[in-house]
Amino acid sequence: MLKKVSKNTNRQGRHQRVRNKITGTSQRPRLNVYRSLNHIYAQVIDDVAGITLVAASTLDEAIKSQVEASGNQDAAKLVGELVGKRALEKGVSTVTFDRGGYIYHGRVKALADGAREAGLKF
């Protein structure tokens, strides 16, 4: 009998294939997205140094106070704007977008649009 592979396992495989091809450097770090059922997280990562330069999520107090629900596109857009603003404050203007194996649609797209509106280039 065949065993069904979970969607999350497939996503992790897609993410691993992409991660083999892209890395974040200090000049152009990687904007990584993680999506859970209730929250969304974004990090700007320098893979060469192995450090997270900037992070934002729907768990931040600045976003929690602005939204009623944290698992929707409005909250994701606010996270994108916040991570973009924090990255620009740290001197990061261009990034490589790592969608984390998720389809570029819905919350992931809203986060990317918010980061672009904040001034990040990718």
UniProtKB/Swiss-Prot annotation:
Family in the record: Belongs to the universal ribosomal protein uL18 family.
Pfam families, alphabetized: Ribosomal_L18p
Region called Disordered, residue ranges: 1-22
Function recorded in the entry: This is one of the proteins that bind and probably mediate the attachment of the 5S RNA into the large ribosomal subunit, where it forms part of the central protuberance.
Biased composition (Basic residues): 1-20
Signal peptide coordinates: none
GO biological process: translation
UniProtKB keywords: Ribonucleoprotein, Ribosomal protein, RNA-binding, rRNA-binding
CDD domains per the UniProt record, alphabetical: Ribosomal_L18_L5e
Quaternary structure and interacting proteins, as annotated: Part of the 50S ribosomal subunit; part of the 5S rRNA/L5/L18/L25 subcomplex. Contacts the 5S and 23S rRNAs.
Gene Ontology MF, one: structural constituent of ribosome
Coiled coil: none
Keyword Transmembrane belongs to the record: no
Stored InterPro entries: Ribosomal_uL18_bac-type, Ribosomal_uL18_bac/euk
Full protein name: Large ribosomal subunit protein uL18
GO cellular component: cytosolic large ribosomal subunit
Gene: rplR
